[in-house]
Amino acid sequence: MLSNFTPDACQREVIEAQGGFHLVLASPGCGKTQILTERIRRAHDVEGVAYADMLCLTFTNRAARGMLERINANIADSGVGDVFVGNVHRFCSKFLFGNGLIAAESSVIDEDDAISILARYMGEDEYSVLGDFKRRREYSVIFHLESMMHQIAMGHPKALRTNTDSINADDVKAMQCICSVRGCAFDAAAMVDIYNNVETYRDLTTADTADYGDYQIIQRLLRKMQLAQQYHQYKKQNNLLDFHDLLLFTYDALNADSAQTEYKRYTWVQVDEVQDLNQLQLAIIKLLTARAYRTVMFLGDEQQAIFSFMGAKLDTLTALKQQSACQLHHLSVNHRSPKYLLDIFNTFAAEELHIDPALLPDAGLQLQAPLLGNELALLYSETYEHEVRDCVQFVDRLRTMFPESTTALIVNANRDAEDISGELTRRGIGHFKVSGSDLFSSPELKLLFAHLAVLNNEFNFLAWARLVKGVGVYETNASARNFVRALFDRAILPSDLLRSAADEAEGQNVAATYLQRFVRSYEEQTIVVFDTETTGLNVFEDDILQIAAVKMRNGVVVPGSEFCVYVETDREIPAMLGDIVNPIIEERKHHTLLSHHAALRMFMEYADGCRLLGHNADYDWHILDHNLRRYAPECDLHESHADYLDSLRLVRLLHPELREHKLKSLLTVLGLEGTNSHLADDDVNATRSVVVHCYGLAKARVEQQLAFLGDARVRQRADILRRNYGEIYRAAIARMYVRDEVSSCFVGALLALASGKSRAETSAPPKAAYAEDKNATDAAAMENRVALVAELQRFYDALVADNMIQPISGLRYVTAYLSKDMIDSTAEPSLYEQLSNHAMEISTLKEADLCGSSSIDERIFVTTIHKAKGLEFDNVIIFDAVDGRMPNFYSRNNPRLLAEDARKFYVALSRARSRLYISQCIRRYDYRNMPHDVFTTPFMRHIAKYFQSNISSTGQ
């Protein structure tokens, strides 16, 4: 069992529930994370389930990280890393990339990126749209229509369609009119045909063929469809996916594999927060489950189903419970909340949510301190403005009385959060705000992360576009994307434009591209095509077992130039390479094994004066470099072969449409000679075939590149990019594989961070949402060996110093989180390792992920109800709990929305661990400055009896 964890009877029942289909109903505080972790241990150790056959899905990344932390802290088995733990979108991304179902260079865009793309076709300023809630919703309809039409075209069942509101009654009428004019039935095929042929139907349905009213709605429909198509085509042309695509493409692939033979299925599945998943996500989970499954367990809570706006339905739990095979469990003990709070939660659940009282949990928490009598209270203020000030003053009192406790002001709307945050800042009270625009969605932070993204993958189109705009090459995102697309279309990477004059010692143009350098080497130099077999993938520590090579001039093998040596090692050689037996083990039995020093010296002498080339040469070059440092330090690879070529990079430049770039796949797809046997000599011959193929394509592209780069306008933009970003990029690349030192230029960043500021923002006033970090010195001390954070800080300081961005007052939260909660700089010291291990994870971060982490020193939080879900605080103040807001005025005649508002209020209540306060004003003024009485939310009618009443939030 987990350390210090003794399960109660209900928890033990769930832990031991193996085999069959199970549904666990668990209200907050019942210890789900502990149970889910212990189930993994038991399934492996007792039931014999392989970790790789386990699938653990959560609703949020934050929940997944929490579970991973618990797993790593309590299960010592290194193989537990094979368990997939994450949300559905994260799994779908991994599935699509891992199975080559999308182009390897694809990027995932968020809603802000999508708006930027669509604004180009709408002829609107993207920043105006981003700041206009109404316009954002109108744009969302277009995005939703695009995904909806995909589902209709692919024949998805109606129950799985997630954005049905993108087609309104007028749209249906318009399509019926079109079908009437055309003389065909109005069905799914007709809808798809209209969508795919907008211009044809625009010509067909002129004003002469329909009355004026019908003509207008037809034109509006066709305009919507045209925009949706343009958005779709733009994504397709630029290898972009939105979050809808991740789900849709995964479902399509799994659904087509009806025999379950092409893609991996899982025999042991557990899914948390199932009530928050939409029907498409549930269908994907069903398709991922092996038909001969061992155990499937869903966990949910009817009281917390608050994400209907994302397609989730409360009916999900009802449908699961009604399945004949379902074994139902209840967690009936709350281990988090004291009885006086649990009484409130249970009363509300029974009376407002109509939960059977027999299913509600009992208190399992024993109080450690006597009650003071002020744990539950109603706070009244005269007006909304007074309420903001009074609540902030009350928070200050709580901070003084309970300095180690956390306090959350939970609000119903982003505007409330802004008002409260502003008042907290005015009073100098440090806090962390989780609402409205997410820190991680800000253009400034996206720019910083784009720098990390291109260091990790220089083929990242979206990251380069953000950089090109961010460092001032273009003023708009659309222009930046067009420029980067023009480069990619000509097999040019933006990094090609960043080479310094020193890099071009042969006197070539500063902007000489990778293809140009390859063609020149191919035609003028002797190329050594080489490959290594190794004990593992760690370039810093693993040993080379075999080096094979051949010399080539103008695509022809130099006679007698074949080279192959086998090398001794004391390290363990893996018996398997994925699912195949490692052939190097048997091969070594038939060859003489040379010492490390002898073998490495032989290869260096063999390659002297030649250009090295490998497939995925970054790996081979760096593992060769570190083997030389250990065993033949007199040989300096940086001095003799600093500039090497990579056929993997060539293929990615010349064949961006390919979904996989492994040698075996390339030989098949491109119809080339060779064998990929995982023996270095065979792989060298296969690589040579790829190189010859690439030369033919590259030669044809060089003239096109020269013409493009010779254009004065392109040269001007390239010069700006090189001037503003070139030195930063080159210095970062030089640091990628540095493991044993901290750059001295980080010292200045440390000193600045110790004061809670960047060097470049020392004179800038703090922004409203964040306060100075009292423990910044400790944070800096921890971060001084985190290479990724150091790189992020360097780039940030450079941008602020050059006035390219405004200071990001919340950056210190991000760097602290990366340093303390994500990256283990002891196990992964270099920038290369940290980027390889965490680039994807970093790209998914949200503000709410930081709450509850060790990196947040603030004790006061301001959050909306939706973003508070899954979090807990010692003290909770539910702000402005008045009728008309809780529930919403527009929900009162809609039973479904009214019920969801009640569940939202339950979520807000149940965030409290120790103290709970309900705040309201008693009077509001309308636009004519006339006063109106305001009444307490009706959700309090059954629980008000538990609270002290008639006290002011100021205590006066």
What are these regions (language model features)?
Residues 86-94, 269-273, 299, 413-415, ...:
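Conserved helicase core region in the C-terminal RecA-like lobe
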Residues 221-224, 458-528, 536, 551-553, ...:
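Accessory C-terminal helicase-associated subdomains
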Residues 1-105, 868, 910:
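P-loop NTPase Walker
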Residues 525-530, 535-633, 637-641, 657-674, ...:
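Conserved non-catalytic scaffold segment of RNase H-like nuclease domains
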Residues 23-36, 40, 326-327, 334-429, ...:
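Helicase P-loop NTPase motor core
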Residues 51-169, 318, 643:
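Conserved P-loop NTPase-based nucleic-acid remodeling module centered on helicase motor cores
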Residues 473, 478-479, 693, 854, ...:
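C-terminal accessory regions
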Residues 4-16, 20-28, 84, 110-114, ...:
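Conserved helicase NTPase motor core
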